[in-house]
Amino acid sequence: MSLLKHMSEFEKLIKKLDALTSSANTSCSEFTNLLIALGFQVENCGSAGHKIARHPAVSLIEYPNYNCGHNKGEAVKRPYIKKLYKFVKQHENAIKEHMK
């Protein structure tokens, strides 16, 4: 029963992430919170607004990144959301397993 509960949570989150790929205005905090709910560790990197999304279930040399812009409350551009969505779909099994 526990597996079904976690899978439905994962499915709900992935569906929300998919919806954001066509959204015109996704706030940085909404996007970041969704990634954290999927188990990502989000780190600020160097310049203003740039973030790296690492997932403990996936070992890579280079992880996907995104930009929140330079102003607080700025929207995340769709190409970044699509890149992270593709990453989650590529590593779906490992991320699902990690969420158990």
Task: Please annotate each region the language model reported.
Residues L34-C68:
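A short, structured beta-strand/loop element
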